[in-house]
């Protein structure tokens, strides 16, 4: 989808219908950029003359779909104001921080939110034992349930540590790897 802003402005610039179409590109993870060899342009039905050093679609000698989207979209957003600030730095920008600085007036972080009428621990049907902030005791039953599903023994006074995430560098797993020996000394279940 990152190519749509470019395609609308280039492939379909002859069609007046698209004059009124504005595009917004949302960055969920700047590490997923869609980088391909320049030969990909033909397969994507893009003009070959769009690709040159420092062009709006080129990064380090490759076609970069995300850069194309960032350069041609009318607006850019991401999942939070904090993430928006982070990815404008060389540490987290994955090579596209310069593009984001160039488009800074069209770039916003919009905070993700949770609908607490759905994701509510005392109403959520996906949680076996409902609980509230006033009564956390059913959390022990949920812990027993989860451990039984994973074949682990239940220890009421031992913390259970888990994470739901993609195993990518941006999630900070290098920090866990660096300290795994110390972490394993704790009396915890993983």
Question: What name fits each language-model region?
Answer:
Residues 1-190:
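Catalytic cores of nucleotide-sugar-dependent glycosyltransferases that transfer UDP/GDP/TDP-activated
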């Amino acid at each position: 989808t990152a190519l749509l802003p470019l395609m609308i402005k280039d492939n379909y610039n002859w069609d007046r219908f698209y004059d009124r179409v504005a595009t917004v590109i949302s960055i969920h993870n700047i590490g997923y950029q869609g980088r391909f060899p320049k030969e990909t342009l033909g397969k994507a039905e893009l003009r070959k003359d769009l690709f040159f050093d420092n062009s709006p679609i080129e990064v380090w000698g490759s076609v970069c779909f995300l850069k194309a989207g960032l350069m041609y979209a009318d607006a850019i957003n991401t999942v939070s104001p904090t993430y928006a600030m982070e990815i404008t730095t060389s540490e987290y920008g994955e090579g596209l921080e310069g593009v984001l600085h160039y488009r800074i007036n069209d770039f916003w972080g919009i905070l993700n939110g949770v609908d607490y009428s759905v994701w509510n621990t005392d109403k959520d049907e996906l949680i076996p034992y409902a609980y509230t902030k006033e009564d956390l005791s059913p959390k022990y039953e949920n812990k027993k349930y989860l451990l039984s599903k994973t074949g682990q023994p239940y220890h009421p006074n031992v913390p259970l540590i888990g994470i739901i995430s993609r195993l990518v560098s941006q999630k900070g797993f290098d920090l866990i790897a660096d300290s795994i020996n110390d972490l394993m000394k704790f009396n915890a279940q993983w």
